[in-house]
């Protein structure tokens, strides 16, 4: 325990500065996490897989008991761990040795020289050293984690050669972009196949978020689960009137039109529409984490049976209607929206309905301000709203709703969102401009 406290304290002093928590506060937090069964060992805190469950549990505890001390400490510790991870300085036993003054090389970000890795890695926990091979460590990585090169040992990370390799001159991998995710989210915890899709149950699996690669609709977190939003933002409750159905219900709106209305809007902007494939059901479409997510809302009768379609949300009738989203049941759509004003769907709460003025308008660059970019890497696209492209493609920028994600159009007239780190601004030839502007 003491060794882990020293490591975490040193990391916090490096990345948090004067706001760094004390060793006493870190120790109290670790004791609580072990008591609650969130950590089998204090050193498990180094694993990114433990961060989301810890955040969810401490957030729920703070809101239920009004005790936010451990949550505040965890926020600082998490920030330090994420900062180290983003700089490719993951908390390993080698870095622990460095911080504790026990020797060992400090993890360095990849440079132009040959990138290397150690043959073995050891973890320090209560004086015990446990050997772990590189192959074993790589096999334990989560599917969404990115195996980034790091320099610690004496053999090349890619080919294993001690000297004389040419890996340093190989093509660099595409840069990371906002939304790709450095560690798995809680969005997929407890999900079952067929839950939360805009297709009949069992037709497709729900996706865990940008970068997961699955298509279809999503399932929100369960009751009481409060998922940490991107960037650690505080819980924000919506100010809209859930009883004003005209502000959020759009009727028979297609999925594509919903994406067009919500793409680029602030997190938490939403609308409710009729399901296009399951009559009588609805879809909650929400702008969150640089994408548009779609959550299926099943309509149930008094005995749990399916309701006939065409009645609209909460339409009066002889039999009361209930609404199922994920594993939560509500008496009406307004009560469902009220619930998600203060509970996270995945990374956001419901903040406001999309404005009706968006229906016939769009924010598009004026002709004299049109910009073009050239693709530096291939991009396959992870969401329905993404625009796939190949290295060397010329794209026309239509608008810039976010700093790291722009809305673009390719030479075939297809439109969608592109990651800014994957492209560079350019001045295409007149022939390319003619093609992109419709002169084909």
UniProtKB/Swiss-Prot annotation:
Top-level lineage group: Viruses
Keywords of the record: Host-virus interaction, Oncogene, SH2 domain, SH3 domain, Viral budding, Viral budding via the host ESCRT complexes, Viral release from host cell
GO molecular function: receptor tyrosine kinase binding; signaling adaptor activity
Positions of the UniProt region annotated as Gag second part: 438-440
Cited SMART domains: SH2 (SM00252), SH3 (SM00326)
Domain SH3: 368-428
PANTHER family listed in its UniProt record: ADAPTER MOLECULE CRK (PTHR19969:SF8), SH2-SH3 ADAPTOR PROTEIN-RELATED (PTHR19969)
Record-given protein name: P47(GAG-CRK) protein
